[in-house]
């Protein structure tokens, strides 16, 4: 799997108002980008990736909108991996791995447990990267293709 996102030849950035309709728009944009990049919609990573993306955008809309009127999604792909990030301007950085026990049952019933179960189950990675000013973050997901 490619390790440097800068090396991924396909990229798309989408910024949306932090409102419920952002979830559907982010997902539909992902479907369009994947099709344009030649990634088969029946690839085993695509449906889980779309669910992960939907959960992350939902979390930004639900929990960060009070401080972040916009959510930005970065889509990227290469020959052997798919990556995306969801960025908002809320400073809270959720402990991604704390939401997942590795037993197939997350510690909670929330979206982050689902995100981590799907990501790790596909052999992917997840990381939270804080903004330099400490007032926002991006959650990056990378999945092998």
Please tell me what each predicted stretch does.
Residues 32-54, 103:
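Conserved short strand/loop->alpha-helix "switch" segment adjacent to the catalytic nucleotide/phosphoryl-transfer site
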Residues 1-17, 61-145:
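Conserved beta-strand-loop-beta-strand hairpin that lines the nucleotide-binding pocket
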Residues 22-23:
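Phosphate/oxyanion-binding active-site loops and adjacent basic polyanion-contact surfaces
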């Amino acid at each position: 799997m490619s390790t440097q996102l800068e090396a991924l030849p396909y990229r798309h950035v989408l910024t949306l108002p932090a409102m419920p309709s952002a979830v559907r728009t982010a997902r539909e944009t992902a479907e369009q980008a994947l099709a344009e990049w030649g990634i088969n919609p029946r690839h085993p990573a695509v449906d889980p990736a779309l669910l992960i993306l939907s959960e992350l955008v939902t979390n930004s809309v639900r929990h960060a909108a009070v401080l972040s009127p916009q959510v930005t999604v970065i889509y990227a792909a290469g020959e052997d991996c798919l990556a995306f990030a969801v960025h908002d301007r809320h400073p809270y950085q959720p402990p991604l791995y704390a939401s997942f026990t590795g037993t197939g049952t997350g510690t909670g019933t929330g979206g982050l447990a689902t995100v981590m179960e799907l990501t790790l189950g596909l052999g992917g990675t997840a990381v939270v990267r804080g903004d330099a000013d400490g007032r926002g973050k991006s959650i990056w997901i990378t999945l092998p293709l």
